[in-house]
Amino acid sequence: MRITVSAIKADVGGIGGHTLPSSGLLDAVRRKVSSSSLLIDHYIGYCGDDVHIVMTHTRGTDNSDIHKLAWDAFMEGTRVAKEEGLYGAGQDLLRDSFSGNVKGMGPGVAELEFEERANEAFTVFAADKTEPGAFNYPFYRMFVDSLSNTGLIVNKSLAEGVVINIMDVSKARTARLVLWEDKPTIEAALMYPGRFVVSSVETRDGEPIASASTDRLHNIAGTYVGKDDPICLVRTQKRFPATEEAGSCFNNPHYVAGNTRGSHHMPLMPVRLNSPASINFCIPIVEALVFSMHEGRLTGPFDGFSTPDWDDVRRTATRRAHAMRRQGFVHPATLVPDELEYAEGYRSRMDVLDSKMVPLKDSGPAGTGRAYEDPD
């Protein structure tokens, strides 16, 4: 049976700030989705102040009816958010009306269409207070780094390598890179998660494994309106990464862009399902929703980051967060200017600085005339 799994998320309001959605907001989203006859099954939850809708159906990816259902559900949530005076009501809905596809309209989208296996397993990773590039490092560990994932050695399909599709989010273009031939190029791209992000992964013979949301909100709105808060789908088991291999790629809380006002680097903390965002400077968080599926019917989710061992990972993330925040505003605690310029306050400060700058007197020709040499 050919099934599509669509995971669509949006921030449409939080209690007292960017914390978590209200029960009224969630109920409004659930009522709208539950009333639809388009779906086989669905699950609705939240990560921080982002609501995610996981849907199964047979209509394929980028389907207008499915995307409109999610859009309408988020609009219903926005209506309640405004009635309740929630902060950031409708924040991620950057267009006035639906235009056939929620991509480019604010919500994050990850979708996979595939022939369902007899025991289909997949995990949804939903993040808050960060950007799509936050998944680059876990994806690298999952599909490239055999020190992190022994499956890349002992599993025949994974050992053959996968195809990683990488998007240049600043220029809206993609590259199809193949392991193991393109390994250095993949690594060079993933060095800068603010620009190059993994959009999807497939086997060398074209079987889809993973899909991730890639929209940057400031690219759509032209100014800072909140972090992008990505979501991704990863099929697991058999010829794909084991569920444990996929999950363990989040056990080293790496530094990601995001945090309060989207202006800092902080570690990505794995948290339990339906966790609010912290008000301890808003540490970026990620949840793992582990599902089984048969004929499009969902069982789960199991809370992938709920077991006791993840408490120690959370303590590591907390220590790293405190260490970074002790550096204050000095880079790399804060983002590079290219990312901060979308914040109006930062732009205005830079305009003042620029107005006070005067050129240096001519000090002779620039450069030494030496040819380029590789760094030692």
UniProtKB/Swiss-Prot annotation:
One GO MF term attached to the UniProt entry: magnesium ion binding
Binding site for Mg(2+) 2: D49, D50, D128, D229
The EC number(s) this enzyme carries: 3.1.3.11, 4.1.2.13
Domain of life from the UniProt record: Archaea
Catalytic activity from the UniProt record: beta-D-fructose 1,6-bisphosphate + H2O = beta-D-fructose 6-phosphate + phosphate; beta-D-fructose 1,6-bisphosphate = D-glyceraldehyde 3-phosphate + dihydroxyacetone phosphate
Pathway(s) annotated for this protein in UniProt: Carbohydrate biosynthesis; gluconeogenesis
UniProt binding sites for Mg(2+) 4: D228
Chain residues that bind beta-D-fructose 1,6-bisphosphate: H18, Y87, G100, N101, K129, Q237, K238, R261, Y342
Residues involved in Mg(2+) 3 binding: K227, D228, D229
Key words, A-Z: Carbohydrate metabolism, Gluconeogenesis, Hydrolase, Lyase, Magnesium, Metal-binding, Oxidoreductase, Schiff base
One of the protein's GO biological processes: gluconeogenesis
Outcome, altering K227R: Shows enhanced FBP phosphatase activity, whereas FBP aldolase activity is completely abolished
Effect of D228N: Shows completely abolition of both FBP aldolase and FBP phosphatase activities
UniProt keyword Metal-binding, yes or no: yes
Binding positions for Mg(2+) 1 per the UniProt entry: D11, H18, D49, Q91
NADP recorded as keyword: no
Binding site for dihydroxyacetone phosphate: H18, K129, R261
Residues the record marks as active site: D11 (proton acceptor), Y224 (proton donor/acceptor), K227 (schiff-base intermediate with dhap)
General function of this protein: Catalyzes two subsequent steps in gluconeogenesis: the aldol condensation of dihydroxyacetone phosphate (DHAP) and glyceraldehyde-3-phosphate (GA3P) to fructose-1,6-bisphosphate (FBP), and the dephosphorylation of FBP to fructose-6-phosphate (F6P).
Homology family: Belongs to the FBP aldolase/phosphatase family.
Domain commentary: Consists of a single catalytic domain, but remoldels its active-site architecture via a large structural change to exhibit dual activities.
Protein name per its UniProtKB record: Fructose-1,6-bisphosphate aldolase/phosphatase
Organism ancestry: Archaea, Nitrososphaerota, Candidatus Cenarchaeales, Candidatus Cenarchaeaceae, Candidatus Cenarchaeum
Gene (UniProt): fbp
